[in-house]
Curated annotation (Swiss-Prot):
Gene that encodes the chain: fusA
Domain tr-type G: 8-283
Pfam (any one): GTP_EFTU
Protein name as annotated: Elongation factor G
Function: Catalyzes the GTP-dependent ribosomal translocation step during translation elongation. During this step, the ribosome changes from the pre-translocational (PRE) to the post-translocational (POST) state as the newly formed A-site-bound peptidyl-tRNA and P-site-bound deacylated tRNA move to the P and E sites, respectively. Catalyzes the coordinated movement of the two tRNA molecules, the mRNA and conformational changes in the ribosome.
Cited PROSITE patterns: G_TR_1, G_TR_2
Organism: Hydrogenobaculum sp. (strain Y04AAS1)
Entry binding sites for GTP: 17-24, 81-85, 135-138
Length: 692
């Protein structure tokens, strides 16, 4: 199926917002008015087309970035619907890698909310053009002008209103179009499908003129020719304004602001017009740059069909019918169903089975995908962030860096049968979601799952049950403590067993001393004169290592220690490898007791970003968690705080930070080092271990 829509007529857009700002509702209206659906799906009825996972329908929030194609004014709009909940912001980030433009939706009541601020920063990072839609103008407490001011104060890039509302709350009926200086009034009885263009109501004329003036001035400031005309008082045509605004939007100089109420079906068609008029096509954005794995040189790929094929996989999902679906955006060239491609990230050849154009969770088979287009492939073994390309012209696009999981919990399958299925399912989840990890705790033997927040892990456990029929018990995670010695000590281990026939004899003398944190284990053989034959030396080391696995204080592994074997004796007949192994183990346990053992706890490097208003509260809270503030940096209205905090004090922190900062703080956490635990913590941990 060759290209049906020229590349300049494509718009790859995302719809991004804080949870509950009306994002999925707006998407539903777009699909309705572009003729993709025949009935409007309401989120609160659990019927929205784009929210297709059972968990989404129940919770009324969007978890997976569903993608769909629709058509408006002769242009194809590929929409990626993204979640607003902070636990799922990874979906937003990976979608941005493949978008050319974004509609940011703000609630006219709540204004610029934390997740929107965070997502706006991501859009800055990925250099994505955007338009803003102030939604929910029908709601009690709605105020377009207050929210517009918040956008000015809280976000980068200057907003420019191209509409203002007519009426508010229950009296909201339409908008003033500042480009054409007329009123658009929606007809209730047609579900907003029809509207009338009227003259601006008398009482809005002065306000409309004032905001039109602001708009023209803002646009003229971005274009020298228009600025001259403006200063000389010449008339600037609507076409000139639109062209200049398109250019300024694509260059991230301005953000056009529109308004409406998606739920009441008002404002959606002009929003679609704005997507077509102001957001870029794949030709308007910088060409993609990657690394050639053979030459390790940077290469640029132009968004043209005759360039070598290269695409970026931004999402992987397991489909109950089709198997693994890999969503991808083609940056150059084209790919046919049934052809072979190179997964350059893994250096592995793959066959593209089927190619699908997606509409939420229904699909249409296609034969070819070309530059600028978004589709899903069946049969490609890939993970999120992989590049697929023409094997003759390999290229690797930048891999996304995802935040490390910040919360873990132990899970245990309820039946033996589920145990076998569980590891396959966990592997599938890890491929789909780079912020989800699963591991086995070698010390406790528990399976641990790690994610971005409690809701994230809840939903994963829920999916195990719904999609794969695996039931698990969920527990609290354990902290992986370690033990270390503080001083030097000498001890001997003697294992002598005399029974009928051949006996057992092993005798060693060792010295232990502490090493620097992170040094691990050093074994020194200082035996001279053959007091212990050399074939018995490795078993001694093995016995010591085994004893180190279960420390003498609370049974945690002993680390950072040097052991010197310097004396001992053997018996011509009775000595054996096993006897020396046991002697080595006995000697180490004895020496460790003498060398005063301490408990080590894992210390995490925590970086918190918070609006300035909450810095005091955040620091106070970190101090109360035995945190040590390592540094602070002011980034405009946000302050970044770095601290070292024991892992045991960080459970529940995500929820706590949210309430401390009204949801506006974010944090990342990674392992830093092990450090000696205070006496009170040691006593508590030892007490818990000896009672279990």
């Amino acid at each position: 199926m060759p290209r049906t829509v020229p590349i300049q007529d494509l718009r790859n857009i995302g719809i991004v917002a804080h949870i509950d700002a009306g994002k999925t509702t707006t998407t539903e209206r777009i699909l309705y008015y572009t003729g993709k659906t025949y009935k409007i799906g309401e989120v609160h009825e659990g019927a929205a087309t784009m929210d297709w996972m059972p968990q989404e329908k129940e919770r009324g929030i969007t978890i997976t970035a569903a993608t769909t194609a629709c058509y408006w004014a002769g242009k194809q709009i590929n929409i990626i619907d993204t979640p607003g909940h902070v636990d799922f912001s990874v979906e937003v980030v990976r979608s941005m890698r493949v978008l050319d433009g974004i509609i940011f939706i703000f609630s006219a009541v709540e204004g610029v909310q934390p997740q929107s601020e965070a997502n706006w920063r991501w859009a800055d990072k990925f250099n994505v053009a955007r338009i803003a839609f102030i939604n929910k103008l029908d709601r009690l407490g709605a105020d377009f002008y207050r929210v517009y001011d918040e956008i000015v104060k809280k976000l980068t890039i200057k907003p420019v209103a191209i509409q203002i509302p007519i009426g508010t709350e229950d009296n909201f009926v339409g908008v003033v179009d500042l480009m054409n200086m007329n009123a658009i009034i929606w007809l209730e009885e047609t579900l907003g499908a029809k509207y009338e263009i009227r003259d601006i109501p008398e009482e809005y004329k002065a306000k409309a003129q004032e905001w039109r003036e602001k708009m023209v001035e803002s646009i003229a400031e971005t274009d020298d020719t228009l600025m001259e005309k403006y200063l000389e008082g010449q008339e600037i045509s609507t076409d000139e304004l639109k062209q200049a605004l398109r250019k300024a939007t694509i260059n991230k100089q301005l953000v056009p602001v529109l308004c409406g109420s998606s739920f009441k079906n008002k404002g959606v068609q002009p929003l679609l017009d704005a997507v077509v008029d102001y957001l870029p096509s794949p030709l308007d954005v910088p060409s993609v740059v990657g690394i050639n794995p053979k030459t390790v040189q940077e290469e640029t790929r132009l968004p043209e069909d005759d360039q070598p094929f290269c695409a970026y996989i931004f999402k992987v999902v397991s489909d109950p019918y089709a198997g693994q679906l890999s969503y991808f955006r083609v940056f150059s060239g084209k790919v046919q169903a049934g052809s072979y491609v190179l997964n350059s990230t893994k250096d592995k050849k793959e066959r593209v089975g089927r190619l699908l154009l997606m509409h939420a969770n229904t699909r249409e088979d296609i034969t070819e995908v070309a530059a600028g287009e978004i589709a899903a492939a069946v049969g490609v073994d890939a993970a999120t962030g992989d590049t697929i390309c023409d094997e003759k012209s390999p290229i690797i696009l930048e891999k996304l860096e995802f935040p490390e999981p910040v919360i873990s919990m132990a899970i245990e399958p309820k039946t033996k049968k589920d145990q076998e299925k569980l590891s396959q399912v966990l592997n599938k989840f890890m491929k789909e979601d780079p912020t989800f990890k699963a591991s086995m705790d070698p010390e406790t033997g528990q399976t641990l799952i790690h994610g971005m927040g409690e809701l994230h892990l809840e939903i994963m456990v829920d999916r195990m049950k719904r999609e794969y029929n695996i039931e698990v018990n969920v527990g609290k995670p354990q902290v992986a403590y370690k033990e270390a010695i503080k001083g030097k000590a000498v001890a001997e281990g003697k294992f002598i067993r005399q029974t009928g026939g051949r006996g057992q004899y092993g005798h060693v003398v060792i010295e232990v001393e502490p090493l620097e944190r992170g040094s691990g284990f050093v074994f020194e053989n200082a035996i001279v004169g053959g007091v212990i034959p050399k074939e018995f030396i490795p078993p001694v080391e093995e016995g010591i290592k085994e004893a180190m696995e279960n420390g003498v204080l609370a049974g945690y592994p002993v680390v950072d220690v040097k052991v010197k074997l310097f004396d001992g004796s053997y018996h011509e007949v009775d000595s054996s490898e096993i006897a020396f192994k046991i002697a080595g183990s006995m000697a180490f346990k004895e020496a460790a007791k003498k060398a005063s053992v301490v408990l080590l706890e894992p210390i995490m490097e925590v970086e918190v970003e918070t609006p300035d208003d909450y810095v005091g509260d955040v620091i106070g809270d970190l101090n109360s968690r035995r945190g040590k503030i390592m540094g602070m940096e002011n980034k405009g209205i946000i302050t970044s705080i770095k601290a070292h905090v024991p892992l045991s004090e960080m459970f529940g922190y995500a929820t706590n930070l949210r309430s401390l900062t009204q949801g506006r703080g974010t944090f990342i956490m990674k392992f830093s080092h092990y450090s000696e635990a205070p006496q009170s913590i040691t006593e508590k941990v030892v007490g818990e271990r000896t009672h279990t």
